[in-house]
């Protein structure tokens, strides 16, 4: 029986959680590794995945990355065109396959379309200009464009989608029949993956219903389309729909449109969604003037003349093409600031009607970004998996300034150029773990600006708190903790100092001692300080909040220590030990307890009680990255810890009351959820580096180069960066320290370019293969390496790491305490 709403639950949230839990066992699908998972997810294998060994050898790096990877299963990726860290992501919004299990009423269906697209779909609604990469939240989808042909899909509306509820699914079985019929399509179109292709900065698809070939590319702030219509037929109109009412789970509360001419429009829309108050401005131009322009405002249709202005909540427009005018090009400038900003962005980034040149220039940007790593593999499919994940790791965060530097702040006001690139779409709870360290290695020029963004957001929010999940000038306050503190610390430790460190520390301190009132965070942190943990009878997610806050307070303490603030350091370090207060020695797990100290009873470690966030007790009990040695002590020493940790990977994968986002299971380890990402690397802290090598390979096998190739929500690059770093042979357990724990490299050879100095760090894995997963011997710069970790400074300096791999483990390597990764230690 579903539980009753808790104190922290609204009725709506309780209803949503109850529904997802009820459906979880059916919807989550089996917990399957790698190929078996893809096999179950029928239809998930794009043509690009059918590679043979050697096929990609010698291909330009741009052709090795496949944006379609991760667009199915639970990856929540979009396949469309974007520039590195671009604000515009021009991509199809899709819907509806003929599959009963797929079309679930309400949040489940929407959640599977967080990026606007899912590979299982067979219908495209149109192409919108803004998307979120791999997140578990849904928003954006601004300024949708769709070609239409009379008698095929000419319509003002997107048609109807039949969404089945769970009772209908039970009645129909596994085959629901056709979700759409042609009369219900509206302006949507059927499509086939056989006629769809993507590479970084470019996307194309054949729209079957109107018989239109659609292509698109993007720059940082602009999008460009090219549409090839069928040969004109007398009396049959061809046109282009522009839908300002379309959105991804966001509601338009105000919109404006100006028809400046028959080939140029401009406007804005304001939405309520995950981002509570978002404003988007655009300028759109056509390569050929339209023969007619019609506008629908809240259902009333009128012919528009140059200079016509419209306002309302639901504004749509149809351009009627001039017959026999050739391919239609469309260019769109986007701005979060103003119409003037959108026009300036368009003029600066796409000044001419040369689609191929924009594709070329954006491709060059991607080539430069992807070429920071030069990696080779024995299998070309692994190479494509690798570079696809590098690509995904370079999509977010998004640059949030106009070309003149102006931006919309967290205070809801427009601001002039702050002197740096302002960023948005920062999934901090996710990316602090691996994505941000990944960026410090591959994109160091962006690191100081990301930190400046965090501090500026703190100042403009005026909430006594650093941001948690900023999205388009809105703080969503999503997830838990204040992990921006660890990001600032991690940047500082790695030598990034071109920001106001005193202002940054003031932001960390204020967040730690006061915190945001939003979502009850201030009260939650007060509970943490008062009780020494977050009581589960007072707040949902008490165990996970306790663990995350322990890390955050440790981060504040480490930052204070580095700045010579001894009293603060002692205070925060003490709070960083609060994780011990939710460890129940009787069960051997991190466990919920009430304000009176009573442990949750009954208790099962494989059940998703409300004490945990994106985890159960198995997965949460190892979330102490700042004090792994302390965690080992709680378990009774090295041997007991290794046994417990191995139990995580070998336990049955069933999770009771699992939400649909519990994915990527290896035993009870859930790679699809971020709290599990560091688990394979913990063995090395107890002197069992060979087990880190084994289990990191097992988890990496969940990834592949298909649409189902990412084992969960990518969350703005976190799961992708995990694979990239793991394939290179290392991963940061405590992301703030600049320490990377060595694992088992997938690369045969790789070099990492430091863009700041031009130096290269080379990794060689001799005798590497799918069977030879164990390090026999390691050398750093020609000298034998006995320890199982490297520092950020070593990885960003010219050097060579040479592994000799083998089939049997070298159980003596890196076993001495001095050779194990430091826990909570920040190297000079």
Model-derived features with residue positions:
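C-terminal segment of N-terminal export signals and the immediately downstream linker at the start
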Residues: 12-13, 34-63
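Extracellular attachment/recognition segments
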Residues: 774
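N-terminal secretory signal peptides
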Residues: 1-18, 25-29, 41-43
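Accessory carbohydrate-recognition regions in carbohydrate-active enzymes
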Residues: 51-486, 490-547, 560-581, 587-590, ...
């Amino acid at each position: 029986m579903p539980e009753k709403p808790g104190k922290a639950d609204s009725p709506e949230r309780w209803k949503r959680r109850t529904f997802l839990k009820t459906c979880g066992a059916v919807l989550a699908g089996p917990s399957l590794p790698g190929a078996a998972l893809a096999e179950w997810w029928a239809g998930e294998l794009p043509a690009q995945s059918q590679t043979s060994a050697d096929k990609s050898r010698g291909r330009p790096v741009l052709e090795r990355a496949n944006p379609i990877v991760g667009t199915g299963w639970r990856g929540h990726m979009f396949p469309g065109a974007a520039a590195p860290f671009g604000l515009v992501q021009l991509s199809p919004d899709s819907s509806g396959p003929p599959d009963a299990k797929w079309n679930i009423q309400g949040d489940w269906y929407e959640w599977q379309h967080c990026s606007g697209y899912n590979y299982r779909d067979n219908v495209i609604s149109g192409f919108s200009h803004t998307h979120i990469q791999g997140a578990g939240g849904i928003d954006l989808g601004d300024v949708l464009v769709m070609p239409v042909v009379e008698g095929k899909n000419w319509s003002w509306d997107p048609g109807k989608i039949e969404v089945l509820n769970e009772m209908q699914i039970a009645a129909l079985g596994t085959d629901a029949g056709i979700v759409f019929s042609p009369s219900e399509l509206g302006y949507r179109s059927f499509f086939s993956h056989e006629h769809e292709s993507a590479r970084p900065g470019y996307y194309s698809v054949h729209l079957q219903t109107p018989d239109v070939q659609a292509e698109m590319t993007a720059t940082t702030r602009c999008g460009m389309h090219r549409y090839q219509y069928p040969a004109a037929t007398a009396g049959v109109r061809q046109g282009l729909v522009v839908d300002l009412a379309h959105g991804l789970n966001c509601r338009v509360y105000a919109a404006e449109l100006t028809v400046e001419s028959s080939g140029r429009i401009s406007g804005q829309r304001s939405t309520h969604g995950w981002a509570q108050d978002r404003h988007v401005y655009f300028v759109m131009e056509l390569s050929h003037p339209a023969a007619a322009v019609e506008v629908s405002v809240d259902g009333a249709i009128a012919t528009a003349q140059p200079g016509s202005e419209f306002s309302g909540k639901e504004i749509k427009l149809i351009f009627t093409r001039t017959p026999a005018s050739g391919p239609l090009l469309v260019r769109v400038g986007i701005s979060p600031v103003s119409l003037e900003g959108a026009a300036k962005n368009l003029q600066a980034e796409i000044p001419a009607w040369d689609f191929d040149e924009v594709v070329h220039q954006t491709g060059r940007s991607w080539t430069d970004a992807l070429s920071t790593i030069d990696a080779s593999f024995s299998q070309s499919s692994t190479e494509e998996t690798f570079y696809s994940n590098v690509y995904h790791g370079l999509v977010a965060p998004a640059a949030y300034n106009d070309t003149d530097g102006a931006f919309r702040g967290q205070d809801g006001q427009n601001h002039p150029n702050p002197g740096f690139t302002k960023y948005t779409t920062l999934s901090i709870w996710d990316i602090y773990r691996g994505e941000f360290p990944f960026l410090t290695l591959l994109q160091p020029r962006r690191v100081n600006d990301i930190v400046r963004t965090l501090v500026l957001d703190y100042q403009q929010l005026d909430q006594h708190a650093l941001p948690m999940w900023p999205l388009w000038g809105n703080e969503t306050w999503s997830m838990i903790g204040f992990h921006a503190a660890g990001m600032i610390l991690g940047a500082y430790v790695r030598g990034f100092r071109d920001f106001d460190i005193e202002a940054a520390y003031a932001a960390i301190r204020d967040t730690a001692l006061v915190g945001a009132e939003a979502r009850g965070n201030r009260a939650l942190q007060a509970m943490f300080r008062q009780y020494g943990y977050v009581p589960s009878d007072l707040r949902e997610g008490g165990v996970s909040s306790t663990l995350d806050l322990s890390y955050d307070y440790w981060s504040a303490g480490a930052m204070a220590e580095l700045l010579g603030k001894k009293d603060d350091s002692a205070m925060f370090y003490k709070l960083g030990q609060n994780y011990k207060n939710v460890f129940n020695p009787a069960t051997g797990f991190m466990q919920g307890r009430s304000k009176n100290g009573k442990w949750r009873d009954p208790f099962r470690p494989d059940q998703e009680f409300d004490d945990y966030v994106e985890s159960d007790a198995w997965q949460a009990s190892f979330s102490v990255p700042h004090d792994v040695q302390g965690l080992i002590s709680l378990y009774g020493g090295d041997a007991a810890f290794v046994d417990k940790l191995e139990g995580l990977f070998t336990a049955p994968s069933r999770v009771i009351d699992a939400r649909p986002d519990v994915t990527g299971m290896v035993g009870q380890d859930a790679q699809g959820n971020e709290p599990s990402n560091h688990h394979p690397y913990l063995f090395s802290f107890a002197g069992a580096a060979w087990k880190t090598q084994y289990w990191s390979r097992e988890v990496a096998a969940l990834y592949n180069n298909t649409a189902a190739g990412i084992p969960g929500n990518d969350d703005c690059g976190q799961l992708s960066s995990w694979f990239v770093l793991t394939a290179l042979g290392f991963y940061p357990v405590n992301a703030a320290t600049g320490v990377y724990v060595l694992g088992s490299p997938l690369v045969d050879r790789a070099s990492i370019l430091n863009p700041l100095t031009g130096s290269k760090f080379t990794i060689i894995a001799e005798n590497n293969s799918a069977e030879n997963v164990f390090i026999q011997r390691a050398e750093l710069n020609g000298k034998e390496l006995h320890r199982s970790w490297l520092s950020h400074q070593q990885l960003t300096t010219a050097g060579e790491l040479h592994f000799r791999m083998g089939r049997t483990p070298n159980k003596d390597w890196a076993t001495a305490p001095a050779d194990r990764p430091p826990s909570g230690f920040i190297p000079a």
